[in-house]
Amino acid sequence: MASNQPGKCCFEGVCHDGTPKGRREEIFGLDTYAAGSTSPKEKVIVILTDVYGNKFNNVLLTADKFASAGYMVFVPDILFGDAISSDKPIDRDAWFQRHSPEVTKKIVDGFMKLLKLEYDPKFIGVVGYCFGAKFAVQHISGDGGLANAAAIAHPSFVSIEEIEAIDSKKPILISAAEEDHIFPANLRHLTEEKLKDNHATYQLDLFSGVAHGFAARGDISIPAVKYAKEKVLLDQIYWFNHFSNV
């Protein structure tokens, strides 16, 4: 395993203030938040969410930032309306049984295949936070991955085999937290070794003073978290800007 299974920290977070500018549509059978005016035949970013799903305000604000940078952005509901909420009790084991990797992979694969078939974008970037990172990695695989580049933050559930399967021509940006038992130092180092061995194009950034989840739902009233969260988004935009033009 390149990152451990999701844990309690994956179900904790802070909601950020702001008014989303995008719109909700049914796209390829999934409730989807769409942002941007760029043609979907040009540059597209698909955001694969954590367990908070595609109605959580934070991810919508993030999508708007990507849209402002010139991308058509889609945030599909890969949880089929079963996102968790901080103010409601949750049986984590039961939730993960409903949203196993096998179940979620079919949902993500279906959306990506139809996106490619319908629009055939010139560039597809895929972003994955925590739970969603596994499926982002799968879509830069040399075995059927449909994205051109990926950016993931504090990943969970990613296997070493999925890291090894990454197409060396498809770049991956990994943003990691210093305090993270889901993606701890030993698994970070193992991930680096595999990427290096496979001659992958990669960048791995480690942020001090932050914990798992910081890029998606961190408490931005804390200066270190605010800096790291904002820096990750800037890095992701720069990453996709660069690799969509090479």
Curated annotation (Swiss-Prot):
Disulfide bonds: none annotated. It comes from the Eukaryota. It is found in: Cytoplasm. GO terms for molecular function: hydrolase activity. Keywords: Cytoplasm. GO terms for cellular component: cytoplasm. Belongs to the AIM2 family. PANTHER family: DIENELACTONE HYDROLASE, PROTEIN AIM2. Present with 1800 molecules/cell in log phase SD medium. This is Protein AIM2. It comes from Saccharomyces cerevisiae (strain ATCC 204508 / S288c) (Baker's yeast). The gene is AIM2.
